Curated annotation (Swiss-Prot):
GO molecular function, one term: mRNA 5'-diphosphatase activity
PROSITE patterns recorded: NUDIX, NUDIX_BOX
Record flagged with keyword Hydrolase: yes
Top-level taxon of origin: Bacteria
Keywords tagged on the record: Hydrolase
GO CC annotation: cytoplasm
Renumbered ranges of motif Nudix box: 42-63
The protein's name: RNA pyrophosphohydrolase
Coiled-coil regions listed: none
Ranges for domain Nudix hydrolase: 5-147
Upper taxonomic lineage: Bacteria, Pseudomonadati, Campylobacterota, Epsilonproteobacteria, Campylobacterales
InterPro entries in the cross-refs: Nudix_hydrolase, NUDIX_hydrolase-like_dom_sf, NUDIX_hydrolase_CS, NUDIX_hydrolase_dom, RppH
Gene name of the encoded protein: rppH
Length: 157
């Protein structure tokens, strides 16, 4: 059996500023793949902690890192890239991620064009509608992480 190589990565489950009064989660549509909705995520640079990477990636991808950290998933969680997906990380079989549950402080600070755009659109959707919108190969990971945050009492909806 071949040893798989995963790219270290962080991902953010971003609750709306109205959480816990409303249970809406930020998702964004990739600029390079129409219809591919996901959480903001990105690689961890050499010498960077996952928390530092989270703040940098949010600033780069959504134009703000003004968040309140609610919880962190306690382990790395991996997924494989689909075999039919053309991805830019050819030396990796997939990504291993650290997930953070955060609450956005101000929705009006979102700016998808602040840096090199990675997303074409965003929306806040109810948690119950999340898995219908997300690309299929990430659904199992999202299910697992959300179940953990609910079970541990960090996500109350």
């Amino acid at each position: 059996m071949l040893h798989k190589k995963y790219r270290p990565n962080v991902a953010a489950i971003i609750m709306s500023p109205d959480y816990p009064n409303t249970c809406e989660i930020f998702i964004a549509e990739r600029i390079d793949i129409e219809g591919a909705w996901q959480f903001p995520q990105g690689g961890i640079d050499e010498g960077e902690t996952p928390l530092e990477a989270l703040h940098r990636e949010l600033l780069e991808e959504i134009g703000t890192n003004e968040i309140e950290i609610l919880a962190q998933y306690p382990r790395w969680i991996a997924y494989d890239f689909p075999s039919n997906m053309e991805h830019k990380f050819y030396s990796f079989d997939g990504q291993k991620q650290r997930y953070f549950l955060v609450r956005l402080k101000h929705a009006n600070n979102i700016d998808l064009n602040k840096h090199t755009p990675e997303f074409r659109a965003y929306q806040f959707i109810h948690l119950k509608d999340l898995l219908k919108k997300i690309v299929p190969f990430k659904r199992q990971v999202y299910r697992q992480v959300i179940a953990y945050f609910r079970r541990e009492g960090y996500l109350g909806c």
